[in-house]
Amino acid sequence: MRIIRDIGHVKRQRRLARWAAFFGFLLLVGTFPLVFLWGSQPNLVLASYVLLFSGFILFNFGMQQIGKWSNTPRHPRADLALDAKLKALPDKYILVHYARIGKKVVEHLLIHPGGILVITTRDYIGKAVARRNRWRKAGLGLTRLFGMSGPQLGNPSLETDQAIAAIEQALAEAKLEVDVDGAIVFLNPAVQLDVDDPDYAVMLLDHLEGYVRSLEPQTPMSAAEREALVALLGKGEELEQPQTMPTRRPVKVKRRVPERVRGDGRAV
């Protein structure tokens, strides 16, 4: 499988996440001096609440983004987790991360023999309930409050709709006819899914490779068509060199055991 990644987008999002968390923290700390002045200057009460609310929102947003764009052995970044799970696919599959299409960045898309699959990922841990294109978190209000700085659910169906629309517009402008579909993939196996009649396939990360292999094309894509899609969709601010993931296991070479020689010169 070939991989194209806009590492420049990753670096920029990391910087934005750190700055958001930093300035959010400063706003939160800035409320304390105003609190001590409340008694002498009551008009500062409103300013204190504005700083507190703004700092809380900005700090939690920054922490969410830091978690999203960090990469550790226990918590791989979304694009790297997809790479690891789909690495056994042959070279006719091309995984593009953070493709800049017009004004929108499509985080993950897979060019496969039958077309293009938009992969919308979520690292959400709790219980996710979906009815067609409507998503909500199930849980107590206090649990939601403490989870504000962690991975969020949002509406992955809407995000997939927007990504598909951007890709279809780019294909139309380039006069390319390719089927585009979407899949919603949850990265954390601890998530609880309650899904009924979703607009797109919803699955855990472990099931993604099997789903991709099941997408049998009516007319397989030619190499020229595939490269035209790569030229159109594989754009970004700082692209990594295209990588090819190995699809075969290395062949183990058996070593010969050295022969032992007896005292009369004959091999044992």
Regions found by a protein language model. Give the residues of each.
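Accessory nucleic-acid engagement/destabilization modules that flank
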Residues: 130-138
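Surface-exposed interaction regions that form or flank ligand-binding interfaces
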Residues: 1-104, 111-112, 116, 125-130, ...
